[in-house]
Amino acid sequence: MVSLKTVQASNAGLRALPNITALFVGGTSGIGQSTLRQLARYADSPTAYIIGRNEARTRPFLSELQQLNPKGRFHFIEADVSLVRNVDAACQQILQQQKKLNFLFMTPGGISLGGRNETVEGIDYLFALRYYSRMRFIQNLLPLLEASSPSRVISVYGGGFEYSINTADLDLKHNFSLLNAYKHSITMTSLSMEHLARTHPAVSFIHVYPGLVGTNIYTNSFPAPVSTFYNYLVWPFMKPFSVDLGESGERHLFHLSSAHYPAKQGIVPQGVPLEAGEVAKGITGEPGSGAYLLNWKGDVRPSTKILAQYREQKIPQLVWDHTESLMDQAVHR
């Protein structure tokens, strides 16, 4: 476990990397908001883009960020990122304004107890938020990421919990269930990141499991009776085993900025320098491989047998080819 003291010392070193540019997708609440708050607290003159659904509700948080870092620049982009075409439009705004992007941090999602809920683009709504839209952000912004140092992508979901998936029905058009969607979102994220780290070695990719964190996800996902039951009757029993939201933000900023998780062939610097220790082992088991599975403590989660099997079968390439094809089809529907 990376101690909180080590995390905070590393985050303080972020001031030595001025003018960091970052994009937070889902940065208006929960883990994304907490991590962005820590970036504002620690970084010197950062530029941050925040993508969310409602600018009016986000204005108080934007004011808070400006107070935390008067030299920082914080830009809100209003978008429903369950649609790939909206992801493209948001990315276009950033591409027109920036020549580099150091950090891409993605947390959009939610919880559902229902069946497949297709968007107008033919993708299940939560599957889009958890996987396809996140991959579209990466695909669109790779030119900016590759022009930067440090350069890192983080997807917060279920790194280390990979399962076997139906490679003949990756988007679950014919075999949808909540469990299958959970498995596919996680495993396809890790496989795509492994592929991208190999094909874009100047960028570091991290799939992290955040642990149990006290956020408003149930309030945002369910009507009052269900969310009230969870918040007042279930959560009190779970809270002792949870990660404080502020600490989660500090730890995720460490994941974003520490040289412990470098790109495979990135330009120096690879983040805040290490005080001690070696670089982390990646998905393939190779130190510094450029793609990492982490738990909330910053520890590397061991790569599963299924990932090794899929690597031999060249499934990472298959998954990424499918992902690119489906996203391109979606925007033309």
UniProtKB/Swiss-Prot annotation:
One GO MF term: oxidoreductase activity
EC number: 1.-.-.-
Recorded superkingdom: Eukaryota
SUPFAM superfamilies hit by this protein: NAD(P)-binding Rossmann-fold domains (SSF51735)
Record keywords, A-Z: Oxidoreductase
Induction and repression of expression: Expression is positively regulated by the cluster-specific transcription factor pbcR.
Pfam families the record matches: adh_short (PF00106)
GO biological process: terpenoid biosynthetic process
Cysteine pairs bridged by disulfides in the record: none
Pathway: Secondary metabolite biosynthesis; terpenoid biosynthesis
Family: Belongs to the NmrA-type oxidoreductase family.
Function noted in UniProt: Oxidoreductase; part of the gene cluster that mediates the biosynthesis of the diterpene ent-pimara-8(14),15-diene (PD). Within the cluster, the HMG-CoA reductase AN1593 functions in the mevalonate pathway, which produces isoprenoid precursors. The geranylgeranyl pyrophosphate (GGPP) synthase AN1592 is needed in the formation of GGPP, the precursor for diterpenes. Lastly, the pimaradiene synthase pbcA performs the 2 cyclization steps that convert GGPP to ent-pimara-8(14),15-diene. The putative roles of the remaining cluster enzymes in ent-pimara-8(14),15-diene biosynthesis is unclear.
Name used for this protein in its record: Oxidoreductase AN1596
